[in-house]
A protein has these predicted regions:
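Predominantly extracellular beta-rich ligand-binding scaffolds that present long acidic/polar faces
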Residues: 1-167
Length: 167
């Protein structure tokens, strides 16, 4: 899929899928800018993932408003331990508002990420959690890498890391 996606507040916004609700998604590509408002789940491919993603790719800048979960590929990955992202990549700059979780690949991970990579600059507002791969990780990461810059602001009380902002 190629094209830009613009969403409002309190949504699940993805370049290809807004909410992957139990689906098994393989060999998919999304190219284009994706943006969402406050209190949103925003991803270059999937806004909110409650399924499995493999051999998936997203390229393009991704942005979200305050109190959002923003990722180059997926905004939030799963509330259960069996939602996996495998062999996936994201390329592009990812920006979130204040108190957001922002990652080059995934904004918030609650499950598994394996064999994946992110390449792009990550930035956010005050109190944001910024990670080159994952902004807020409460799951498992294996054999994955992040390239690019994590752009923090010293007086913004942010949590940031080259791979993960908060683990």
């Amino acid at each position: 899929m190629t094209g830009d996606v613009v969403g409002g507040a309190s949504g699940n916004i993805g370049g290809l899928i807004g909410h992957n609700f139990g689906g098994n998604t393989e060999y998919v590509v999304a190219r284009g800018k994706v943006s969402g408002g406050n209190l949103s789940y925003v991803g270059g491919l999937v806004g909110y993932n409650d399924g499995d993603l493999s051999s998936a790719e997203a390229s393009g800048d991704v942005s979200g408003g305050a109190n959002s979960f923003v990722g180059g590929l997926v905004g939030t990955n799963g509330d259960f331990v069996d939602h996996r992202i495998n062999s996936a990549s994201a390329k592009g700059n990812v920006v979130g508002g204040s108190q957001s979780s922002v990652g080059g690949l995934v904004g918030q991970n609650n499950s598994f990420i394996t064999n994946s990579l992110a390449n792009g600059q990550v930035s956010g507002g005050t109190y944001a959690r910024l990670g080159g791969l994952v902004g807020l990780n409460m799951g498992d990461l294996l054999n994955s890498v992040a390239y690019g810059n994590v752009k923090f602001v010293s007086n913004y009380a942010q949590s940031y890391g080259g791979l993960v902002g908060v683990n």
